[in-house]
Amino acid sequence: MNWKKEILEKLAFIKSHVKSASLGAKEQEVSYNPCLSEEDIATFEHKHCITLPEDYRSFISEIGNGGFGPGHGLLPLDKAIVDFKLRDKPNISLNEKFPYSDNWNEEWIASFDWEEEYPETEIVDAYISTAHIAGCLQISHFGHGCTFLLVVNGDEKGHVWFDGRADYSGLIPKMTDGHKMSFMEWYISYLDMEIENINKSLTDSIND
């Protein structure tokens, strides 16, 4: 089964069962935005001096430019470059390389006395600066300011990372079977998790 067929079949299953399974998503939310044209994608890549990871590029051109996904859903490409967590909503610099290859967090966080004080504004601003996520798209808002990142520039290109800086947990690559997850691995694993939750909910309702 090719990835496009697999995704659409899994989405159809989720959409057809989401109401009976009493899950949080509504039927109208289990959908995708219109696809981007090849011309639109090429223009974006040229503007930011990058090439998108092939699986993500195929997704937004053949499945949809954002929509159903982890957290609050997949963000469309033009929204994925904006760091919405910050007051001035700066764009993320995609033509710079993502600076990390392994879990990262500031050392001061582990030793900080959170019950007695709060870090100075300058320290927090440096911690949440977009410089830490240069070369990344924010592809999904997980909640409480935490996001999923797709690296599009640097040695980590094509890998999905979790940005937990909003709750001071740093930057962490998403892993599966001992290796870092690609966009497609990450997204299909999300669909599989939703299907597992639906099946469990349906089984529980039968047994009640």
Enumerate the predicted regions with their spans.
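Structured loops at beta-to-helix junctions and adjacent beta-edge loops in soluble globular domains
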Residues: 63, 77, 140-142, 151-153, ...
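Long, compositionally biased interface segments
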Residues: 169-208
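A surface-exposed partner-binding patch
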Residues: 1-131, 135-138, 202-208
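Segments surrounding the PLD/"HKD" phosphodiesterase catalytic module and close analogs
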Residues: 147-181
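Generic alpha-helical propensity signal that fires on short helical segments
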Residues: 66-70, 74, 155-157, 166-168, ...
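Extended serine/threonine-enriched, polar tracts that run as long, contiguous segments within proteins
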Residues: 129-153
